[in-house]
């Protein structure tokens, strides 16, 4: 068994994983948007964003319009989640402030280590502090988010 990016040694035929640095969950700053975007795109198996992508004001604006948290291991972004500011019409016609959660991703090297859980907890905590009454989520893997209180609200079949 050879040592690779996830191993630092081979001892008696067993790969040994290196000790991980602590992971910090924090609000994503504008100069960190691109690193966060690359984590999200990687989670979707999409190519990294390009300089041309970030030259478009619409791309930069889309990252500035909401609230974003990222997981950092040292200087490397390893996870991300964000929420757009939104309003939802509820029964009776009232509108309530909503956190429209999106752009969730974790690097493959950091899955199943609590990165998503910590990022979602921070994002939802921040949403409450910002006065959001609801949180909505459109996910490709809806079952993952049940532990945060989300469930399928409807299905469309044709």
For each predicted feature, which ranges?
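Extreme N-terminal basic, low-complexity initiation segments
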Residues: 1-10
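Short amphipathic alpha-helix that is part of the acyltransferase structural core
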Residues: 14-85, 91-100
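A broad, structural surface signal
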Residues: 34, 38-42, 117-125, 129, ...
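Short coil/turn motifs at secondary-structure junctions
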Residues: 86-88, 109, 142
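"Short basic amphipathic alpha-helical interaction patches in structured regions
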Residues: 96-97, 118, 151
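Conserved acetyl-CoA-binding loop-helix of GNAT-fold acetyltransferases
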Residues: 103-128, 147
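Conserved active-site alpha-helix within GNAT-family acetyltransferase domains
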Residues: 129-133, 138-157
